[in-house]
Amino acid sequence: MTVTAPRLAVVTIARGRHAHLAGQIRGLRAQGRGPDVYVVVAIDDPQVHDVAGRLSPADWDLRRPGTGLRDGRMPLSAARNLGASTAIGAGAEHLVFLDVDCVPNPTLVARYGEILADAPGVGGPRVVCGDVAYEPPPSLPGAGADGRPRHHPARPPLPASAVRAVEDVSLFWSLSFAVTARDFTRVGGFDEDYLGYGAEDTDFGQRLARSGGQLLFVGGAGAVHQYHPSPSPPVQHVADIVVNANVFADKWGWWPMQTWLEQFRDRGLVHRRLDGRWETNDGAAPGPDGPGAAPAPLEGAARGQATSRTTSTLPRVALE
């Protein structure tokens, strides 16, 4: 009897980055096993759907939901949740999330599908992350003489057959990960209180831990993050980062992105209020109702976001 593999969806979200989306589609077309469903969520950018429709093969089940900005800010969490619900509605049991900047290696879809199919079906949810290498700037030679993409030092590549459990859930990055539809629902998806850039990945890791789940790093599911310029620290997102850091600290009782916040402070961009909260020096981001930053193209989630469990002056929120 032939056993049919569970239906697998690749989900990406995009605003701008049309050339990078085209690169991702080329990478998906080169897979040994392609996606059964391809979900491309456009954020305030109808051209994203045009690119996906023009370049995706006719035999793919292409789904193209969309969402707008919220208070002038990018609803990254809500867009990912919309992508997941669209994929599940199309019958997908396995979900692979790829940042729009990421081009999958030829074995990524098959490897993620293999790992998810081996899920025990009991215990807490599992989230699986493959490694991501970063394409160097076109004018620079890269890390080595061959100019090949470089891996983040916190995420060195694993052998193709390796599976490694990771205790530090703050190492979860949404650039490339896979999860069963059931486990995504058990985690609760991404928290939609976060708007714009920053902290939503760290929050998802905390949700995974709270649900009794496990983070796994695997080999054989690599991707390449296509280059785009991004300053460090990401000063273009300072307002979003301050708002989202406060949201996170209210919820979890410790500060994410501590290094970035301190670097912003050293540059005179932010300060700590007497109550312990962070605020931009123009007062633009005192909390989640602040005006936020002007919209920017979708960032590739660095995610060099440093996290810190330094206790804030806010009350620690107990994990449920």
Could you tell me what each predicted segment is?
Residues D131, G147-S170:
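Short, flexible, basic/aromatic active-site loop/helix in glycosyltransferases
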Residues L171-V179, D183-G188, D193-A221:
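A short, conserved alpha-helix in the catalytic core of glycosyltransferases
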Residues L69-I88:
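Glycine-rich, basic loop-to-helix element that forms the pyrophosphate-binding segment
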Residues R17-A30:
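Short, well-formed alpha-helical segments that are part of the catalytic scaffolds
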Residues A92-V103:
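Short beta-strand-to-loop acidic/aromatic patch adjacent to the donor-nucleotide binding site
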Residues T107-A145:
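Conserved donor NDP-sugar-binding/catalytic core segment of glycosyltransferases
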